[in-house]
C-alpha cells in the first residue's frame, strides 16, 4: 500500500472519526504548504516542504500529522513531524503509518505511542488548558476573541506564509497578555507591512482597546521615517473603510489648523509629528519634509527638554492611540537622546510595536533595550533557505568614488599629477 492509499484508506478516516473537518470550527488541512523550496538557479527550486495534515480549530493551527505508507515503520516520520511543528509553532505533532500513531509534545519534550487522535476540543484543551485564575481567564478570552477574526484574504488572493502567521500570533498573544512594548524582527522582503495590516485588522474587528472593554475599535498609528513607507502602508491598509484611514500630512494640518482626530488608522512620519505646531510652514519647509531631511532643530535635544505642546504630536492626548506601529524602528527612534523618543514617551500608554529587519548589534542595542527581545524573528538566511527570498553573492567592485584618475576637463582644487591613481585617503589632501 503506497502513501496516498494509506492516507485515503487509513489515516484520513481516523482523523475524521475524531471530528476533524466535521466539528464546527475545525479544519483538516491536507498537503499544507510550508516553504517554496530554495532557489538554486536556472529557474529551479529545491523540494518545497508540505505537511501531510495540519489540524486547525478556532482559526488556530494546533496539530500536525506526518504520514508514511503502511509498510514503513510508524516512527519513520518523527523527524519531519518535529521539524514541521517547530516551523509552524505547534505544540502537538504526530507520526503515523496508518496502523499506529506516535505523538510528540514539543513543549514538554515528551513523546510516545497514542491509541487515537484527539478530538478538536481535546487537542484545544491540551494546547490551551482552561485557566482557573480570573486574570488568566480574561487573557484567554481575549486570545480567543482576537484569533476568531479571520485573516483579511483580499478575495482569496492572500494567504499568510507560515512565519507571517507565527509573527501575527505572537503579537496578538502578547497584547492579550497585556505586554505593551513589542518587537518583530523579520528580514527585508518578508512582508512586515502585510503582518502589521493583519494585526491591525484583527484588533480592529475584535474591538480591542487599551481599556479591554470591547466597547470600541482601537485607534492605531502607523509611524514611519519616510513618506514613501507611510504611503505604502496607507495603500496596503485599503481593505479598511475609506473613512477609517487617515494620512496625517503637514498640508492637511496647515489647512485645518489642527491635527486630524476622526478616524481609526492613522499614518504619518516622525518629521510631521516633530514639526512645531505654532510655526507657519512655507512651501520650502514642506519640500524639506518631502525630502525627509532629518535636520529639524531639536534633533540633538534630549527628549525631556521638549515641550510637547509645541509640536504636532502634542495636540493628541497621551492615551489617544491604543496601538502604535513603528516601522524601521532601528533607525534611532528609541534612543534616549533622539527627538523621536519624545513621541513614544508622549504616547507611553499605547501598546508600541516596533518593526525592524536588523538583528541586534552594538549600534542598535538601544532599540532592543527599549522594546525588549523580539516576540518573533525570521532571519535572512531562513527566507533564502525557505525560498521566499532570492540568494545573493557579495561582489567587490571599485567605483569612481573609491579611486580617481584626472582627465582633461575635470575641475579640481589643488595640484594634480596627471596619470596618477588617487585613492579615497588622498581626496582631502589634494
What does each model-found stretch correspond to?
Residues 2-63, 68-219, 224, 228, ...:
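ATP-dependent helicase/translocase motor core
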Residues 365-430:
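Interdomain helical connector at the RecA1-RecA2 junction of SF1/SF2 helicase-like NTPases
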Residues 233, 277-279, 329-340:
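Conserved ATPase-coupling elements of RecA-like P-loop NTPase cores
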Amino acid at each position: 500500500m503506497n502513501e496516498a492509499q494509506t492516507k485515503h484508506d487509513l489515516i484520513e478516516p481516523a482523523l475524521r472519526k475524531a471530528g476533524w473537518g466535521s466539528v464546527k470550527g475545525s479544519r483538516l488541512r491536507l498537503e499544507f504548504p510550508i516553504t517554496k523550496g530554495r532557489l538554486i538557479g536556472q529557474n529551479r527550486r529545491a523540494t518545497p516542504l508540505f505537511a501531510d495534515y495540519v489540524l486547525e480549530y478556532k482559526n488556530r493551527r494546533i496539530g500536525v500529522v506526518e504520514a508514511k505508507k503502511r509498510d514503513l515503520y510508524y516512527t519513520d516520520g518523527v523527524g519531519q513531524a518535529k521539524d514541521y511543528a517547530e516551523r509552524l509553532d505547534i505544540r502537538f505533532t504526530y507520526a503515523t503509518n496508518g496502523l499506529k500513531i506516535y505523538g510528540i509534545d514539543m513543549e514538554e519534550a515528551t513523546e510516545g505511542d497514542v491509541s487515537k487522535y484527539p478530538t478538536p476540543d481535546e487537542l484545544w484543551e491540551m494546547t490551551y488548558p482552561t485557566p482557573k485564575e480570573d486574570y488568566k481567564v480574561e487573557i484567554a478570552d481575549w486570545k480567543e476573541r482576537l484569533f476568531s477574526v479571520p485573516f483579511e484574504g483580499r478575495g482569496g488572493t492572500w494567504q499568510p506564509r507560515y512565519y507571517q502567521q507565527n509573527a501575527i500570533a505572537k503579537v496578538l498573544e502578547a497584547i492579550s497578555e497585556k505586554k505593551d512594548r513589542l518587537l518583530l524582527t523579520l528580514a527585508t522582503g518578508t512582508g512586515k507591512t502585510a503582518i502589521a495590516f493583519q494585526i491591525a485588522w484583527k484588533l480592529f474587528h475584535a474591538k480591542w482597546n487599551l481599556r479591554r472593554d470591547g466597547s470600541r475599535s482601537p485607534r492605531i498609528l502607523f509611524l514611519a521615517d519616510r513618506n514613501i513607507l507611510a504611503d505604502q502602508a496607507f495603500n496596503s491598509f485599503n481593505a479598511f473603510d475609506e473613512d477609517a484611514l487617515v494620512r496625517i500630512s503637514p498640508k492637511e494640518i496647515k489647512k485645518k489648523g489642527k491635527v486630524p482626530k476622526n478616524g481609526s488608522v492613522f499614518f504619518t512620519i516622525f518629521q510631521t509629528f516633530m514639526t512645531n505646531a505654532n510655526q507657519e510652514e512655507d512651501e520650502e519647509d514642506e519640500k524639506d519634509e518631502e525630502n525627509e531631511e532629518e535636520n529639524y532643530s531639536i534633533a540633538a535635544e534630549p527628549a525631556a527638554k521638549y515641550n510637547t505642546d509645541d509640536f504636532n504630536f502634542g495636540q493628541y492626548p497621551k492615551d489617544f492611540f491604543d496601538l502604535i506601529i513603528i516601522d524601521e524602528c532601528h533607525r534611532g527612534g528609541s534612543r534616549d537622546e533622539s527627538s523621536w523618543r519624545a513621541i513614544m514617551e508622549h504616547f507611553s500608554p499605547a501598546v508600541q510595536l516596533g518593526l525592524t529587519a536588523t538583528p541586534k548589534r552594538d549600534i542598535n542595542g538601544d532599540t532592543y533595550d527599549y522594546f525588549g527581545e523580539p516576540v518573533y524573528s525570521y532571519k535572512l538566511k531562513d527566507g533564502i533557505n525557505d525560498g521566499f527570498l532570492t540568494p545573493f553573492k557579495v561582489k567587490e567592485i571599485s567605483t569612481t568614488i573609491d579611486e580617481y584618475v584626472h582627465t582633461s576637463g575635470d575641475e579640481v582644487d589643488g595640484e594634480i599629477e596627471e596619470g596618477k591613481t588617487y585613492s579615497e585617503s588622498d581626496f582631502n589632501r589634494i
